[in-house]
Amino acid sequence: MQENPERIPVLVEETYEEIARRVARRIADLIRARREAGKKTVLGLATGSTPIGIYRELIRLHREEGLDFSAVVTFNLDEYYPMEPSSLHSYHRFMWENLFEHVDIVAGNVHIPRGDIPRGRIEEHALEYERAIAEAGGIDFQILGIGQTGHIGFNEPGSSASSRTRLVDLDTITRRVAAADFFGAENVPTQAITMGVGTIMESREIALLATGEHKADIVRRAVEGEIDRAVAATYLQQHPHATVYLDAAAAADLTRRKTPWLLGDIAWTPTLEIEAVVWLSRATGKSVLKLDDADYRDHGLTPLLGRHESSGALNGIVFNALSAKVRGRSKLPQGKRVIVFSPHPDDDVISAGGILRKLNQNSNEVLVAYQTSGNIAVFDHEVRRYLDFLRRTSCDFEYGNQRLAPLLQEVEEFLARKEPGQVDSDSVLMLKRRIREVEALSAIQVLDLKPEQARFLNLPFYQTGQVRKDPIGPRDVEIILSLLEEIRPHIILVAGDLSDPHGTHRMCYDAVTRALERYAGLPPDVWYYRGAWQEWPIAEADILVPLSEEELRRKISAIFKHQSQKDRAPFPGVDEREFWQRIEERNKATAHLVDQLGLPEYFAMEAIVVRPPARPASKP
């Protein structure tokens, strides 16, 4: 048994919404308590997708419960440099649009580093920012996120514990992650003005928030690792009142979640037993059926062994459970109605191309529902290529040239004067949408589906022309609910790949969940696929679908049909490999692990998690 390796208090909630409500309520209580004492409240604020839920809850508390911001003073962590306050990418604009203009805060009480000052004045501006914080009495409550490099604010690897507000160079990984917001890494500023680690550490209370599987590894390093200049978030271990707030996905790599049996007695479940035995198999390099009593004892699993007659009996139970997960085509459903929800027009083939084809081969009524257009992920040069095709063919076949010519000219002129990161015109967005649609239709035909088996939902929340989307609204839910009522599916497949850097997967998941809550029909089984950003662990997966070499090649061929995404996707995240390369490696790796555990050897595998059906809506 080992001691809990967590070096900072951690609170884990199952969902991001629960985290946002908890932190917002803590801030509201602080504002009210200090107001009653005749004091102002000084908040340190962050930007990005992580704190938006907090800001929405604070706005709700202001509107519905009268939370008063007139005595609140705010200091933001950072701002890109150079950056005009009016820019779509400005943190000034972000804060006003997402919080300040919705509450009764005094404009003079808002402080955000300026990205528009002359370079020669930056040092003076940084000193003024530090003085303003001190004159306000210091920060009472600081909100932080954590970057892929472990940065807090823009304190990149190597930042000193005593650093103050200053101009910094942005890490390559940080700029890559931000590429989605700027429509390409080349458009991301190379510098930023940020509060220093020392400035942050002087806050009286700190809340660091992290959500999603993609943050799990860096969260583990920040929470369980030694204090390290290479991971600025580890400095928070020295703060007396810092707390890390995580959703279940971001907490996945913490010892308490990943290997809880190492920390002491636990309530064993069949799933935990499988996880422990798979972990032991990998730790020892032995297949499941070859594990012996000494392996269990030497790796802290004596309590698990004591629950069974022998190591052989336990090994057999786990081996049989793992074997039951493997389901080739003959063991997959037949004659069912199936909806495959695909957040973007390529997620279906990327993450579930193999199972999609097998379900279709099994005489199921399969429909692929593309939830968003994916149009912001199309490069401008792709549009120019299609425009050239239209122009040439209109001359060849003499169709609609008089009506087509003005449109072509309008689009070409717009693209010629378009600034980096500028929102596309309606015409350009429409063309990019159609490009993604024809690619999606071409891709599913490679998997033997017909074009009429596709439905393009074009959910409204996505239609901003920007990476930052609107919240899921009633119309989004109605569209999905209407589809459920029309098809009345037995099974739905949903993206469980919630680490999508720009959040669309998570929002599409929320839209389906809300629709299921209102759906009055027989609840469908919900299958969750992954693949674009990570794969399900073997122990967590409920279905493992074997793919032959030919089937994997066909799946990759389907991915190739998404030509606008193939060579270099506009928003690849930190992983710069093409999607087909990620998928090939992940699907092969899953099969290889199954082989190492002692199960039959397969060329590749897709993994699916099955959740219980949602409870049907109550009838009036």
Enumerate the language-model features and the residues they cover:
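N-terminal glycine-/serine-/threonine-rich phosphate-binding loop
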Residues: 1-42, 60, 332
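Conserved phosphate- and dinucleotide-binding cores of soluble alpha/beta proteins
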Residues: 6-7, 11-14, 18-19, 81-89, ...
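Structural motif
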Residues: 42, 73, 140-141, 205, ...
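Short Gly/Thr/Asp-enriched flexible loops that form oxyanion-binding sites at enzyme active sites
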Residues: 54-60, 152-165, 500-516
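A short, structured active-site edge motif that brings together acidic residues
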Residues: 71-81, 111-116, 455-457
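Short internal beta-strands
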Residues: 72-78, 210, 243-248, 367-371
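Active-site beta-strand->loop->alpha-helix modules in alpha/beta enzyme cores, enriched
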Residues: 119, 275-345, 349-528, 557-561, ...
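A conserved mid-domain beta-alpha-beta active-site/ligand-binding segment of alpha/beta enzyme cores
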Residues: 536-592
